[in-house]
A protein has these predicted regions:
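Active-site neighborhoods and metal-handling regions in enzymes and metal-associated proteins
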Residues: 1-202
Length: 202
């Protein structure tokens, strides 16, 4: 059976500290997203948030990666590189954010992603859990496309919460992946999608 390393209370505190730096990146990026801003400018927002939080980027320079955040727009699945692209209303944008801190002679890493639809107000987690969903039109955006992107965003967030609910004492990390896959598969069946996990990136 594989060895499972148990963390000390102090180590868990350091892990949380790294996670809070990543949470601050999320907050800064959500506040900055707007039509017309470039993904490179959003990377600058990310870099500033990392510095303000007392962390360092665990993306910048990794195998030559040139930025502090991965920004994937529309049909880019993952690991999009920030550049000159200007966000447009209705774009669905995924931000994969990371940072680390150094404590106790080691690096402690945080890494988390979120998605937004440009031109819509971000629905906070508590409101989303209570059933709040985006409605209405975004000027100049095809409504069928917008509906599909809203559905994708909602299912993704639902799968995240299912994964978190699957974590418990004595459970293995594989429970997270199983929970995500189950939610995606169930919603694909309900909505008639051809959807699933992109296994090549897992």
């Amino acid at each position: 059976m594989p060895h499972i390393e148990l963390k000390t209370v102090e180590q868990l505190r350091w892990m949380r500290e790294a996670g809070l730096v990543v949470a601050s990146i999320h907050e800064a990026l959500r506040a900055a997203v707007r039509p017309g801003i470039t993904t490179r400018e959003l990377d600058e927002v990310s870099a500033q948030a990392i510095a303000d939080g007392g962390g360092a980027s665990n993306f910048l320079g990794y195998y030559g990666y040139p930025a502090t955040v991965c920004i994937s727009v529309n049909d880019v699945i993952v690991h999009g590189i920030p550049g000159d692209y200007e966000l447009a209303p209705g774009d669905i944008v995924s931000f994969d954010c990371g940072a680390f801190i150094e404590r106790g002679g080691k690096q402690w890493h945080g890494d988390a992603a979120f998605s937004v639809i440009v031109g819509e107000q971000f629905i906070e987690d508590a409101d989303f859990a209570a059933g709040t969903r985006a409605t209405g039109a975004i000027a100049g955006v095809d409504q069928d496309l917008l509906r599909e992107r809203r559905e994708l965003d909602a299912v993704t967030r639902e799968s995240l919460w299912a994964a978190l609910a699957g974590l418990a004492t004595g459970k293995r990390i594989s429970a997270v992946g199983k929970a995500v896959e189950t939610v995606v598969a169930e919603n694909a069946l309900i909505n008639g999608w051809e959807a699933g996990i992109v296994e090549e990136f897992v």
